[in-house]
């Protein structure tokens, strides 16, 4: 897979291509359906497959203060997409100049002139171009003129009633429906980061933790979760995590933090990049007035998590 950052780095492709376009935030089951079709069409017609992403995502640029909270960072998004064996990911910088590009110019200047498009695979709600004026009808009209085919993929529904979309997955997470979010994503929702040094309070209580500083725009409530983490060549370990500002008798932190305690684990994770997969919310974050009350609650939480994972 080749990653091209920015239109200025895109050279004209001489061979034909199949293209898909979108934010692909979360790379959920609906996105995976698009990626699967893109791969199959490329393989069947022996042409290059190209996926166009935007960074930042359009609403993050156009409406920064009220933009949707991200399900995936650009790094994780690309990591998940890699498994679909797409030939080229074109990551376009979404800025003032690009946002003012008309739908017609986007098709002609990028899809036709640069990518030599023969197929475009898009979702049934796809809009593009300045002020979102471009739609599937326009694509089909220009496709007829320039000899490329538009393949419209219908939205997936979970149990024939819930549309699988990034919006609905964010809604599930913020309503603490972690298990439903997992079903719409096709995998557990996850948070990645590098393990930082903490104040070692957990270690003093007998429950050492690996800590990750969280970005502000994660669509997740504070609380305690049943988790698995991936580290050391993607090996997975079971544990429990707290997300929040740790509001207990000794807290002085103001920034948001993820703290994960792993069961039967004694390896050093400092400076390691880990991915934390959330399976179920156990409870909300609470204030504890004493060390003993906190320790007692942690013990109860761990028992709940171990039962959830059938470890006891």
Curated annotation (Swiss-Prot):
Gene this chain is encoded by: ribF
Top-level lineage group: Bacteria
Protein name listed in UniProt: Bifunctional riboflavin kinase/FMN adenylyltransferase
Family, as annotated: Belongs to the RibF family.
Function: Catalyzes the phosphorylation of riboflavin to FMN followed by the adenylation of FMN to FAD.
Keywords: ATP-binding, FAD, Flavoprotein, FMN, Kinase, Multifunctional enzyme, Nucleotide-binding, Nucleotidyltransferase, Transferase
Lineage: Bacteria, Pseudomonadati, Pseudomonadota, Gammaproteobacteria, Enterobacterales
Name of the top EC class for this enzyme: transferase
The protein's Enzyme Commission number: 2.7.1.26, 2.7.7.2
Functional pathway: Cofactor biosynthesis; FAD biosynthesis; FAD from FMN: step 1/1; Cofactor biosynthesis; FMN biosynthesis; FMN from riboflavin (ATP route): step 1/1
BP GO annotations: FAD biosynthetic process; FMN biosynthetic process; riboflavin biosynthetic process
Keyword check for Manganese: no
Record carries keyword Flavoprotein: yes
Catalytic activity: riboflavin + ATP = FMN + ADP + H(+); FMN + ATP + H(+) = FAD + diphosphate
Pfam families: FAD_syn, Flavokinase
Molecular-function GO terms, alphabetical: ATP binding; FMN adenylyltransferase activity; riboflavin kinase activity
